[in-house]
């Protein structure tokens, strides 16, 4: 019975769908073509910020037809809650020289902007050939530092969102769409 109630609560916390799986895939296909045109024949390194962007990264790299390499960083500013701590902790850094690449940081969501600005500045200091940011979701009304992505697929209102790699307490990452997380349950 306890497992049933836990599953029921899990499902009840999935709020309204904000962006469908089909909308996500269509937009990623568009962005893949943009990246193809921007970097034709030049060395690209897609840098995924874990954990949230891993699903987006997988789909985006398949939508790009020009050769690209991938790398990962893990940064945390949320520690099993719904509010950012305000501190950026680099849990895993990239393991290569990026000075011979055009680096595209692939992010799941820009919220306050603190985490991404911190990572952007770290990467910029390592002298890539160029540096751009692509984010799946952009929550501008929560921004506390000035930072904009070069490409933002979807602007979203100030909801805590789950799905398509985004989580709450490590759950809901496997949803194929973006939904509002119901905190009131």
Regions found by a protein language model. Name each.
Residues 1-185:
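PRPP-associated nucleotide enzymes
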């Amino acid at each position: 019975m306890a497992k049933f109630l836990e599953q029921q609560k899990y499902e009840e916390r999935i709020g309204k769908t904000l962006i469908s799986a089909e909308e996500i895939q269509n937009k990623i296909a568009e962005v893949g073509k943009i990246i193809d045109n921007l970097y034709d024949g030049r060395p690209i390194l897609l840098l995924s910020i874990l954990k949230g962007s891993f699903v987006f990264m997988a789909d985006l790299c398949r939508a790009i037809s020009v050769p690209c390499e991938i790398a990962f960083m893990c940064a945390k500013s949320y520690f099993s809650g719904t509010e950012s701590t305000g501190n950026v902790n680099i849990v895993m850094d990239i393991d290569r020289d990026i000075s011979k690449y055009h680096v595209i940081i692939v992010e799941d969501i820009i919220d306050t902007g603190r985490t991404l600005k911190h990572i952007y500045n770290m990467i910029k200091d390592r002298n890539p050939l160029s540096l751009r940011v692509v984010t799946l979701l952009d929550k501008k009304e929560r921004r506390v530092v000035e930072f904009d992505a070069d490409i933002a697929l979807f602007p979203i209102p100030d909801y805590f969102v789950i799905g398509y790699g985004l989580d709450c307490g490590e759950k809901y990452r496997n949803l194929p769409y973006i939904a509002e997380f119901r905190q009131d349950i």
